[in-house]
């Protein structure tokens, strides 16, 4: 990811655009992070994605399906910087395609406004309160069917979560040609290697 980011920012500069604020620190409610950059003054996060994930940037549907929290992340940076225009420069790492998705957090006429309007400060306060609770929170997402096998698997966002085994202690991992698949229920044993 870091090499792709550096390559893309070099290409952005070579094409005549201005890149600034690289890895500038941002802070909101005690949460500190480093933004990727601003391109021509627009707060920008650089992403390398699979072909499947790339569609969300190309089709401008990220706001409606954001399992990795990219929206909240960039809203935090925007709050820290006092910006309202944000964007993602995404590269499909399988095909080399590029897309730039730009949202204006204050554009009340935009189709994504209802999804984007939640105040990031309130969101951060809520998450901090949830983390302080003695009991773990409800599951973020429910398992989904794994095709027609009768098995249930973690949704994409949960499959990357470091706490998936806390939520699902009996989780089983099977190694498919497309990568690991995390099954919460096994009705039919997959005919691929299980990772223990």
Q: Where do the protein language model's features map onto the residues?
A:
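Metal-dependent nuclease catalytic cores that hydrolyze phosphodiester bonds in DNA/RNA
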Residues: 1-43, 50-64, 68, 183
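Short connector loops/turns at beta-strand edges and beta->alpha or beta->beta junctions
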Residues: 48-52, 92-95
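Short, functional N-terminal and low-complexity linear motifs
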Residues: 41-45, 82-85
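Metal-dependent nuclease catalytic regions and adjoining charged, substrate-binding loops involved
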Residues: 64, 76, 80-196
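The N-lobe alphaC helix and its flanking beta3-alphaC-beta4 segment of protein kinase-like domains
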Residues: 71-74
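Generic beta-sheet signal
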Residues: 22, 46, 89-91
